[in-house]
Amino acid sequence: MTAVISLPDPPQRASRGPRVAGPGQDRLGKRLRRQVGQAIADFGMIEAGDKVMVCLSGGKDSYTLLDLLLQLQKRAPVPFELVAVNLDQKQPGFPEHVLPEYLAALGVPYQIIEQDTYSVVSRVIPEGRTMCSLCSRLRRGALYNHAKAHGFTRIALGHHCDDMVATLFMNLFHHAKLAAMPPKLLSDDGQHVVIRPLAYVREHDIAEYAQARRFPIIPCTLCGSQESLQRRQVGLMLKQWDQDHPGRIEQIARAMADVRPAQLADATLFDFRALGHSGHAAHADAWLADAVPETPAD
């Protein structure tokens, strides 16, 4: 059962919003606003009249996303609407009061979706196994349904540069494909445009910004599930690279925007068969060993 609590004009609560910026935080904030604004411009993430659903989990990434979008909204070249949306999955111990109080104090329109996906995942996934994959699918479905029902034209997620690079290596190492996490995508059913405005922002900058702003962070370990061993290994690898070779993560991120099909091996992206003097090539089957007749012995 799904319940939606919609509070477009939140009442005043005895809670505080983000901390007022100091000099150092203001410099970081300017850099992050510039990076987010650049990503929005580069990929056409937000257009005039868009109604943007900002998915807020209570983690540092989504808090930072909402905070920066609210700041950019005041000076954006086009008008757009922002609504914070949280999916309450009924995890045991989830502090349901935190987000409503924070958003009410901030004066931000918000909606809370109440859907008990935790019980579903707990029933289906054996104890000790990671719940993240199924939980993610159920969460995505709930958010897509909500976006459709309430007329949202954009769904904004808090994935950042490090997430995109990690996904690239997850696909490379474990799925034998060069694919990552796009800054903007159309959902499989063609009904939703998903945007990731933090695509150019590094995770360590988000962590510093969130700490300086004193966001009321909600732990992501309430469900007792942990990230997969594979993703944890990739994360440790990237963290080590970042320490040993500063700038490497940014270089990898830039490489994802400079793909050269002619220097890879995907024949669906580049016509290798057309290269040569005549532009003609025998069919692949003709080169298979079992397709070439043996020459009879004399």
Swiss-Prot record:
Q: So which cofactors does this thing need?
A: Mg(2+); [4Fe-4S] cluster
Print the keywords alphabetically.
4Fe-4S, ATP-binding, Cytoplasm, Iron, Iron-sulfur, Magnesium, Metal-binding, Nucleotide-binding, RNA-binding, Transferase, tRNA processing, tRNA-binding
Q: Can you list the GO cellular component terms from the UniProt entry? A: cytoplasm
Residue ranges, annotated region (Disordered): 1-26
Enzyme class, one word?
Answer: transferase
Q: Which Pfam families match?
A: ATP_bind_3 (PF01171)
Binding sites annotated in the UniProt record for [4Fe-4S] cluster: C132, C135, C223
Q: Where is the motif PP-loop motif annotated in this sequence?
A: 57-62
Under which pathway is this protein filed?
tRNA modification
Places the protein is found: Cytoplasm
UniProt-recorded Gene Ontology molecular function terms: 4 iron, 4 sulfur cluster binding; ATP binding; magnesium ion binding; sulfurtransferase activity; tRNA binding
Annotated catalysed reactions? cytidine(32) in tRNA + S-sulfanyl-L-cysteinyl-[cysteine desulfurase] + AH2 + ATP = 2-thiocytidine(32) in tRNA + L-cysteinyl-[cysteine desulfurase] + A + AMP + diphosphate + H(+)
| Gene Ontology biological-process annotations | tRNA thio-modification
Any further remarks?
A: The thiolation reaction likely consists of two steps: a first activation step by ATP to form an adenylated intermediate of the target base of tRNA, and a second nucleophilic substitution step of the sulfur (S) atom supplied by the hydrosulfide attached to the Fe-S cluster.
For this chain, the family text in UniProt reads:
Belongs to the TtcA family.
Quaternary data: Homodimer.
The entry's protein name is tRNA-cytidine(32) 2-sulfurtransferase
> What is this protein's gene name?
ttcA
